[in-house]
Amino acid sequence: MREIVSVHLQTGQCGNQVGSAFWQTISGEHGLDSSGVYGGTSDQQLDRLNVYFNEASNNKYVPRAVLVDLEPGTMDAVRSGPFGQLFRPDNFVFGQSGAGNNWAKGHYTEGAELVDQVLDVVRREAENCECLQGFQITHSLGGGTGSGMGTLLISKIREEFPDRMMATFSVVPSPKVSDTVVEPYNATLSMHQLVENSDKTFCIDNEALYDICMRTLKLSNPSYGDLNHLVSAVMSGVSTSLRFPGQLNSDLRKLAVNMVPFPRLHFFMVGFAPLTSPGAHSFRAVTVPELTQQMMDPKNMMAASDFRNGRYLTCSTIFRGKVAMKEVEDQMRTVQNKNSAYFVEWIPNNIQTACALSPPRGLKISSTFVGNSTAIQEIFRRVGEQFSAMFRRQAFLHWYTSEGMDEMEFTEAESNMNDLVSEYQQYQDASADDGEEYEEDAPMEE
């Protein structure tokens, strides 16, 4: 049985580093070594390997990944890294000039020159698929390439493959850790695109990752490698049901149908368990209640917004390893009953659970959490405030206008983001009996 295919795009420095960590993780789970040769032990590993990998000759598997950047540095780092031999050499597409943290360069000038080259590679990968399911993109929203060129690619791919799913793993700017001054501009302009063109966006944020590393994993000085390791654990968890036989959410579209009640509200927060410091997990057995409690703990969410400030529209949990389905179902029911204030009551059964038999490497059981909560508006609100403060004074605007952008675009992006925040707020405040107010206008029965 031929399975579905995901073309994986990595744009910019952040996207490539996170993406490479992801490929490293899933290669290990499928029993592939650093050059893509299969040496695994179980048939399950091979069963749906073709979702993410193409089979080359002599038992070698190649990731269906396209690596994109506007400067060669990141590519060289990936190539010379431990898994550099895994990727197809033709799938590295890079410019020479860099985007200089400027969204306009990534979207309109430098990125636009490179985009056709990238689309050729994407087209070639898509044509080799028997039944293309969709695209998965890793990028950051704060820089120039991942945000500007990433969103350009998303809209171009949308034009060409309008009926395919588009999932993005987006690293959103964090409240205290800022890499560039113009982050709010880049992020707002990107959000403007993602709201329209992405089907689901998993929001990840560096500060939340730092907090997890320091608070839970007890690392005193976390490196980007540690952060990427966390993200790749979540990405691997989210894609488990695509890669291993299971019952629920077995493709991108099914997950989206279960998770997105209104098309614009497709920004998810993610969590993972068990998170223990590297030496500690051998000292205790992990139980399903513990996993559930940990993955739904606000401290372990990988986006800096606290779900207790909003309500869940929907959420999905993926358990991996030998867990009893009944135990999982009971546990999730308990969670929903205890925390009913944090779930909207007008979507019944809004928790989905999926189980897959194969655990991640080094763990007996694990769980991943994906939540569509109205609290995610905190992120947009925060970025929006920073955006307004700078835009009111027209600070740094010349960098964008000199690349041919119009102030109008900034205004549109700002109002689109404000609309998004108020939509989240509206559904947070809605209750099950709100429908009655419309019935006054109904004609009287004779």
From Swiss-Prot:
CDD domains registered for this protein in UniProt: beta_tubulin (cd02187)
SUPFAM superfamilies per UniProt: Tubulin C-terminal domain-like, Tubulin nucleotide-binding domain-like
Subcellular locations according to the entry: Cytoplasm, Cytoskeleton
A cellular-component GO term for this protein: cytoplasm
Annotated Mg(2+) binding sites: E71
Chain intervals with Acidic residues compositional bias: 431-446
Region described as Disordered: 421-446
Matching Pfam families: Tubulin (PF00091), Tubulin_C (PF03953)
Co-factor(s): Mg(2+)
Binding site residues for GTP: Q13, E71, S140, G144, T145, G146, N206, N228
Keywords of this entry: Cytoplasm, Cytoskeleton, GTP-binding, Magnesium, Metal-binding, Microtubule, Nucleotide-binding
Nucleotide-binding is among the record's keywords: yes
GO molecular function: GTP binding; GTPase activity; metal ion binding; structural constituent of cytoskeleton
Known role: Tubulin is the major constituent of microtubules, a cylinder consisting of laterally associated linear protofilaments composed of alpha- and beta-tubulin heterodimers. Microtubules grow by the addition of GTP-tubulin dimers to the microtubule end, where a stabilizing cap forms. Below the cap, tubulin dimers are in GDP-bound state, owing to GTPase activity of alpha-tubulin.
Subunit structure: Dimer of alpha and beta chains. A typical microtubule is a hollow water-filled tube with an outer diameter of 25 nm and an inner diameter of 15 nM. Alpha-beta heterodimers associate head-to-tail to form protofilaments running lengthwise along the microtubule wall with the beta-tubulin subunit facing the microtubule plus end conferring a structural polarity. Microtubules usually have 13 protofilaments but different protofilament numbers can be found in some organisms and specialized cells.
UniProt similarity note: Belongs to the tubulin family.
Protein name (Swiss-Prot/TrEMBL): Tubulin beta-1 chain
Protein species of origin: Hypocrea rufa (Trichoderma viride)
Lineage: Eukaryota, Fungi, Dikarya, Ascomycota, Pezizomycotina
